[in-house]
Amino acid sequence: MESFEGEGDSIQSPDNARGDDVQNTGEHIQDPGPGPSTGGASEGLVQNEPDSRDQQSRGQRRGDENRGWMQRIRRRRRRRAALSGHLLDMEDNVPPWFPPHDITPYVARNIRDAACQAVKHSHLQALSNLILDSGLDTQHLLCFVMAARQRLQDIRRGPLVVEGGVGWRHWLLTSPSRSWSMGYRTATLRTLTPVPNRVGADSIMLTATFGCQNGALAINTFSATVWIPPPAGPREQERYAREAEVRFLRGKWQRRFRRIFDLIELCGSLHHVWQNMLQTEENLLDFVRFMGVMSSCNSSSVNYWFHKTIGNFKPYYPWNAPPNENPYHARRGIKEQVIQKAFLKAQRQGLSMLATGGGPRGDATSETSSDEDTGRQGSDVELESSDDELPYIDPNMEPVQQRPVMFVSRVPVRKPRTLPWPTPKTHPVKRTIVKTSYRSDEAEEAQSTPERPGPSKQPSEPVEPAHTTPAGRSTVILHEPPREPEAVSFKPPPPPSRRRRGACVVYDDDIIEVIDVETTEEETTSMQRQPPLGQQPPPPVISTGSAMSSSHTDPSVTQPSKPHRKPQDGFQRSGRRQKRAMPPPVSPSDAGPPSTRPRVMAPPSTGPRVMATPSTGPRDMAPPSTGPRDMAPPSTGPRDMAPPSTGPRDMAPTVVHMFTRERLLTQSTGPAPRSFWEMRAGRDAPKIQQEPSSQQQPATQSTPPCQSWVPSVYVLPAVDAGNAQPLQISHLSSMSPTQPISHEEQPRYEDPDTPLDLSLHPDTATLPPTQDLYPGREDLQATQAPYPGYEEPRPPQAPFVGDYGFVQIPSAQWEPHPSQGTYQGHIDPQLPAALDLGPEQPRFPQDPYVYSGGQLSSCPGYAGPWPSRPQHPRYRHTLALWPREPRHGHSQGPWKPWSAHLPPQWDGSAGHGQDQVSQFPHLHSETGPPRLQLSSVPQVLYPQPLVSSSAPSWSSPQPRAPIRPIPTRFPPPPMPLQDSMAVGCDSSGTACPSMPFASDYSQGAFTPLDINAPTPKSPRVEESSHGPARCSQATSEAQEILSDNSEISVFPKDAKQTDYDASTESELD
């Protein structure tokens, strides 16, 4: 009762309970209502009333009148509730919703006039197109508008998520299949609510969601309430059949009569058409002929249309003017006899005249036709010929079932599907010609032997890596861009053995971390085969670019030399990766004068040395190869080749677990890198100890050349005071095992028990502190070396903010060390053997995108988790972090109702003004402000191809395309302009109502808000080197396959089409 009787039930009745005084109105006799009637109190009131009636003051009498009025109101409310099926004061009773204003039914003319006025306003163009192009009747137009309004309310209110999420379906309208038969488009429109005379109208935003078959998935929308037109009864079906027959007949008529048909249907007034809509005398005579045909027509369907359109059953002839008025045709200069003659002739010929034009069918030159008919036919032939050149739809044509071929650009031929991460192969691989390795780079020898020819120069289609190494050798695969083969003389290598060793792929873009290493005895012994001290060649001096200054060329700075590598150790890098992620290598002219160019020095026993001049720039002494795979950029420094007598260090393990993640940094900064095994050398320190004689090296050696471009990933610099052994980290672009790195790059692990590993760095050196690599970061010089769980900081120009805009802090697996400066004689110990990453830790799941633990940060080259979503997800607020994989009881995150209309707010993925990534992740104390540890959250919500292919159009701030007005020469609506109810049927009377939300009315009326929205032509579109595309700009070229811009309609099968609306004369003035 509360909801129906409202707030005013207790107005001015402080003494009476609700529902009393019912007896005074006599209501309890007719309809006492289920309300609690307090009979006793009201009876007492009735007994006292005759006595106190005269003593009542004026205010009491007014209160009594108000009470009687409220009783009347209550009775009306009760009856209304009973009629609507609601009984008051019942449990679980939800009263019906009543609109706040009176809704008066509209006639079609009001809406038509409003649509015609809306054409003038560009922001109302879509609504007018909806009304005028599809020709709905009033009921269905209102149904369309109410459905759009319902969807607007749903968006503003948000999903009513009940337990289990069954209350409101959150439809993400994407599909992994390439051809999905249903697409949705939205059009947003600012209008006023339809109230009479715009009194009290509210400005609302209409967002209509329309479906079109075979339409592109233009935008991710939430579904409006699926509105189904009311089923047509038998009378409606008769009416639809009549309308369809009239449209079919109209399609056969000549164009001039079709135009009069449409004018009469549009205006509904014969006088208006006669006096205002016909320009020439020939048009007036055509109107007279049309009226003659209508007056004698015996087709019930045409009669029904005509009388329904003009509004009465007695057609009047507008040329019969009232007697005191000069008729309109006389003012136009047409005689009465001409009009009567044309009218009678059309009456005799009937409906066939509208199709043939009045003349005999096969005889265009007959003399029997009148003069006006002859002239009319000549011009009509011209019009029809020009009409045929316009696009039209034949009434008997098959309906379009797919997009026309002209709009379908060819989907590029798919390459063989491969995994987007380098796959380790720990078994022998026979070389095949099948190009299946799509992302893992060619891991073949730099030497292409006659029995194993090198791959062809096809960077776009890399071949399956065939790892063939000598028996004692491991392959450290470092990727370089293609280089020209060099003419160097060297003895051919021993025959390669087919044993595939674990390879560490280290390059600019990806860091592959070796987790499990099982070193065998043979590898340990081969690692100890170092060249004696006398064979260590003095590395040449190079002065590099502006980032590194002459501090690297200080002769006192020595560099622990590495044993030389055979040419078939196969350092190579894919040209694709180099092209994409690396700055172009410095040309020989940029690297400095010819005296400071890198010189390749071989040991004395090698034989002839090759000096790399600036013009030739050979990287190493290697036999000429057929492919460009083994050459490094000239800026990365030399590679020293050893004679085959000096056995190579075999550091490759047998079991290698690799993990790749895409580099998020844009440019590389810092000096030259080394292989991963020298970086991880501290593991084998107790096993491989060198004799102390080879651990020292003459300090006269000068530093080998560094790269002239700065490294892409660097570690925290540490001041090397004393004779600490610098552990050379492999910088991600290095090709050479003998490259030095500046000591900004030397990670040193502090553990008091483990001695320094000198086996891999046989020469000690005292490195004076060089100048800072990055100006303005002097504080980094004094910080400690990273602890094992440390993740490397990013350069300040590209901070890595975590997946959703949170700074990645080191995993809680390792305790952060307190920060303190290094004292003078401080020696940083190596990684302890206790922290050896054994085969049981960490275990990675099969999916390399998903890892739930924080163990990855224990690897030195780790640079943060792989971001599992596109860089601009749609809902960026902090609580919408969906779990990366659906769990039990997974419910959707909270709803942000304004995100549907507002541009997204970028938190930290764009890298503009957010907080920078902390350069000292190990300085975060445990008591600091709590940060979200995203590394422990599983990282994929949906499969990756779905996320990449359905990147929402909000993911990048692209300009929204305005809603285009529709050209007039559009294919016609499939229904009559007045009463179609979106139902197509043939003349036999069977109706096939097409659901408007699956219909094609939106084809002309609306265009997608975002023309650049991606279309999932395949599950995975245009990926970068690993995983889905990072930005919508990268995919926008490849995804403009099926756009929704084409003005092609899909019509119901049996709708009879005409070509009137495609004409040039279709504007009605």
Swiss-Prot record:
Keywords: G1/S host cell cycle checkpoint dysregulation by virus, Host nucleus, Host-virus interaction, Modulation of host cell apoptosis by virus, Modulation of host cell cycle by virus, Repeat, Transcription, Transcription regulation, Viral latency, Viral latency initiation and maintenance. The keyword Repressor does not apply. GO terms for biological process: symbiont-mediated perturbation of host apoptosis; symbiont-mediated perturbation of host cell cycle G1/S transition checkpoint; viral latency. Transmembrane segments: none annotated. Residues 1-75, 353-708, 733-776, 884-932, 1008-1069 are annotated as: Disordered. The keyword Transmembrane helix does not apply. Residues 381-391, 507-524 have a biased composition (Acidic residues). It is found in: Host nucleus; Host nucleus matrix. InterPro entries: EBNA-3/4/6. Plays an essential role for the activation and immortalization of human B-cells. Represses transcription of viral promoters TP1 and Cp through interaction with host RBPJ, and inhibits EBNA2-mediated activation of these promoters. Targets host chromatin through interactions with host transcription factors, especially RBPJ and IRF4. Alternatively, EBNA6 also regulates the transcription of the EBV oncogene LMP1 in a cell cycle-dependent manner. This is Epstein-Barr nuclear antigen 6. It comes from Epstein-Barr virus (strain AG876) (HHV-4).
